[in-house]
């Protein structure tokens, strides 16, 4: 009998911080299940979730404003430990009788926190000892407001030169507030602090591991599906690949994978997917060669969002056609992951703006009479990759750079043509090959080539040529929300440029994109 890996769970209430998902990922890394909910959750919902502890996230609002978000009152009467982070500490302090004020001295970045009082939260956790003999923590601050008076039943645990209450605690109730961000790597002991809260103070057992997640998923899939058949759109990307492997382990040949070759994939990608999943792992795969259909639908279209929607629509049409041929199929599997669920919830409540539409989220027709199977919907991307390794998928496939759902359809600027895609595929393959050879591939977060629909004069031998331009793009980022262009060596860029121009007939010029995000996005379209 498998252990209940959801037995011990942490509830994280989201007040809008850019780091909130990182808090959840850190808790999962500790080995404990957690969920991320909006701050205005009801008492009944919290009772039903039955958390072992609650974390209040940071956020951009000011608790000094009358309409700023507040934690539900039940959070402080539920009888479980509570950790407030940054804004979470401020709202905890204010709601329990303390004071918060705006400050002329804002703290953004590195700070040293001096420990004044012993606390279960940080006992024996320190980075150094200062001349006064106090333990010191190196932390990351990001706040304007600050607590100026703590609730009467709290004590001051730590402070900085400009923040008198950097950590506060009520040990009896197991309520703690930290003005810094323990979830970011700049807070050196942040993970130890979170481990102390989750494992010791909340008394959670670390049951959330790749092996137990797989075991639990297989049991639940078999219970949900029974003896029925399942269909899955297999793209060769991380999410659909891990979904396929989980389902294959759970139900074997009752899974049918539909692989749509849209003509917008990377060089030799279709052959690689079919060889790996069909020949090596023995999955049942239906190969749909649909390059002509996609390119016909994209003819004459140059607006990026229109291209995305067309690619999504044609994929759904093809998938629907194949699903109708599979008379035994009762379930549709999707590689939805936890950030998709969070994003969809935010969109449903009007708290998010669509910057680029996702071609594979919520796109399948409502009239399809199939049940939905989403075995990854509780997992973050890093967890999906770890599970993939456990299931036997190769590291290089799981950890390769992100590739957009519409594929080369949004890396060929303007109208998409077969000629452009063929040239781009070959140029991009050279760039990626050289990154691997120079041991640079894993030192950048994402790298790819973009086809520009403009011609440029070049000289080859004694003749002139008038051919196409491509741009190389490489970025470094932690979360893909912001990114810096990668400072690749000039000799490396020169080598890539020479190879592309000499080996790809039809390209006469190679440029390098040095735009950051913001103001640019990582992808060009």
Curated annotation (Swiss-Prot):
Catalysis performed (reactions): XMP + L-glutamine + ATP + H2O = GMP + L-glutamate + AMP + diphosphate + 2 H(+)
Enzyme Commission (EC) number: 6.3.5.2
Annotated binding of ATP, by residue: 235-241
Domain of life (superkingdom): Bacteria
Gene3D superfamilies: 3.30.300.10, 3.40.50.880, HUPs
EC supergroup of this enzyme: ligase
Key words of the record: ATP-binding, Glutamine amidotransferase, GMP biosynthesis, Ligase, Nucleotide-binding, Purine biosynthesis
GO molecular function: ATP binding; GMP synthase activity
NCBIfam families the UniProt entry points to: guaA_Cterm (TIGR00884), guaA_Nterm (TIGR00888), PRK00074.1 (NF000848)
Name recorded for this polypeptide: GMP synthase [glutamine-hydrolyzing]
Organism expressing this protein natively: Yersinia enterocolitica serotype O:8 / biotype 1B (strain NCTC 13174 / 8081)
Source taxonomy: Bacteria, Pseudomonadati, Pseudomonadota, Gammaproteobacteria, Enterobacterales
């Amino acid at each position: 009998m498998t252990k209940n890996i959801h037995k011990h769970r942490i509830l994280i209430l989201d007040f809008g911080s850019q780091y909130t998902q990182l808090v959840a990922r850190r808790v999962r890394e500790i080995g404990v299940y957690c969920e991320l909910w909006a701050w205005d959750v009801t008492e009944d919902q919290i009772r039903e979730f039955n958390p072992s502890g609650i974390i209040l996230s940071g956020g951009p609002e000011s608790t000094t404003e009358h309409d700023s978000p507040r934690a539900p009152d039940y959070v402080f009467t539920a009888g479980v430990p509570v950790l407030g982070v940054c804004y979470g500490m401020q709202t905890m302090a204010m709601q329990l009788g303390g004071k918060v004020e705006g400050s002329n001295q804002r703290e953004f970045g590195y700070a040293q926190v001096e420990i004044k009082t012993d606390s279960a939260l940080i006992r024996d956790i320190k980075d150094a000892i200062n001349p006064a003999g106090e333990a010191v923590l190196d932390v990351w601050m990001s706040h304007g407001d600050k607590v100026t008076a703590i609730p009467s039943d709290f004590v001051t645990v730590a402070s900085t030169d400009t923040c008198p209450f950097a950590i506060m605690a009520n040990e009896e109730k197991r309520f703690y507030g930290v003005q810094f961000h323990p979830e970011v790597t700049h807070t050196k002991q942040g993970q130890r602090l979170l481990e102390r809260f989750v494992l010791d103070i909340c008394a959670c057992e670390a049951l959330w591991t790749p092996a137990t997640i797989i075991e639990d998923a297989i049991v639940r899939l078999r219970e949900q599906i029974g003896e029925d058949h399942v269909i899955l759109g297999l793209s060769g990307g991380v999410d659909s690949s891990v979904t396929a492997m989980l389902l294959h382990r759970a139900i074997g040949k009752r899974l049918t994978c539909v692989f749509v070759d849209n003509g917008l994939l990377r060089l030799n990608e279709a052959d690689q997917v079919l060889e790996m999943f069909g020949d090596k792992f023995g999955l049942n795969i239906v190969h749909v060669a649909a390059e002509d259909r996609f390119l016909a639908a994209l003819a004459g279209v140059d607006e990026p969002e229109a291209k995305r929607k067309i690619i999504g629509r044609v994929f759904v049409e093809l998938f629907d056609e194949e699903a109708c041929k599979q008379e035994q199929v009762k379930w549709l599997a999707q590689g939805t992951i936890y950030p998709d669920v969070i994003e969809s919830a935010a969109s449903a409540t009007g708290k998010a703006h669509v910057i680029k539409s996702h071609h594979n989220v919520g796109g399948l027709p409502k009239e399809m009479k199939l049940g939905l199977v989403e075995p990854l919907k509780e997992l973050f991307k890093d967890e999906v990759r770890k599970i993939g390794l456990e299931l036997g998928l190769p590291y290089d496939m799981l950890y390769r750079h992100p590739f957009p759902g519409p594929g080369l359809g949004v890396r060929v600027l303007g109208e998409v043509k077969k000629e452009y895609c063929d040239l781009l595929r070959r140029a991009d393959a050279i760039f990626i090959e050289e990154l691997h050879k120079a041991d640079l591939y894993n030192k950048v977060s994402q790298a790819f080539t973009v086809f520009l629909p403009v011609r440029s004069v070049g000289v080859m031998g004694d003749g002139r040529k008038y051919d196409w331009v491509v741009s190389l793009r490489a970025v470094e980022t932690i979360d893909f929300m912001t990114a810096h262009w990668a400072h690749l060596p000039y000799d490396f860029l020169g080598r890539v440029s020479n190879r592309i121009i000499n080996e790809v007939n039809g390209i006469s010029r190679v440029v390098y994109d040095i735009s950051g995000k913001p103001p640019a996005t990582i992808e060009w379209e």
